[in-house]
């Protein structure tokens, strides 16, 4: 069976989940966010907890160090169900093939969201340490052929309006985190383009600026990163590894952090990353994603029924 798998991703509340549900109405198999795992499966609500840690830090009832530890712990919990699902499904996907898909699976986020993108945004705004970011990013799993990741984009004002209108229990609007996330997802797109062009981070390291506190503060306040046709190293995720905490006195990465970037190259290179504007209606957005499928990679699998069973089991337990 020829299978097309699409990961819809991006900063929260862009409309990706609604778009994915519309695609499911057209016959796609939809894998929702594992909201139950985060909010109701255990004694603690991870979504509310990660916001509560920042509130307590701001009002002085929790130290910055303790808040960072709580946030890193909660961020790891966000990643867990994605990693478990990815580990289960990866062996079921075969080599790339030509021809139209016979099954389309639409995932609400790729593991890169919880292991790399959100941790980096949290590092930018000061919610977690550089060490926590590197540790979480190191858990990003490898990607077999056929990974098509579509990053949702949205006008900044409309994005903030949607976020304020959502009002999920335990959440609050964090404009700095939202700005950081928008920058980080632009970095993800640029990373894919940088790697696809054949460039190597070691060749450009010396020309990239430091990812110091001033740079991070700017990324939390201003939308500085945008998808570029020919990005520089500082426009990519690799630029974050030039944080002073991760380098020696001369600005060179410690060897273990160089290994971390090499691993990131190997894991992200197989992903085909594109963008889509989710400003229009959900039906128009779903059609826009569908229009991109002609350029996406399809894989062969002898386990179509098993994939469907796994997705149904995950959805019944983790969806809300």
Curated annotation (Swiss-Prot):
Top enzyme category:
transferase
Q: Which residues bind ATP?
A: 10-17, 162
Q: Where is the signal peptide?
A: none
Q: Where does substrate bind?
A: 51, 75, 168
* EC number assigned by the record: 2.7.1.21
Please give the superkingdom of this protein's source.
Answer: Viruses
What SUPFAM superfamilies does its record include?
P-loop containing nucleoside triphosphate hydrolases
- On whether Nucleotide-binding is a keyword of this UniProt record, the answer is yes
Function recorded in the entry: Catalyzes the transfer of the gamma-phospho group of ATP to thymidine to generate dTMP in the salvage pathway of pyrimidine synthesis. The dTMP serves as a substrate for DNA polymerase during viral DNA replication. Allows the virus to be reactivated and to grow in non-proliferative cells lacking a high concentration of phosphorylated nucleic acid precursors.
Q: Which family is this protein grouped under?
A: Belongs to the herpesviridae thymidine kinase family.
Q: How does it assemble?
A: Homodimer.
Name-wise, this protein is Thymidine kinase
Q: Which gene encodes it?
A: TK
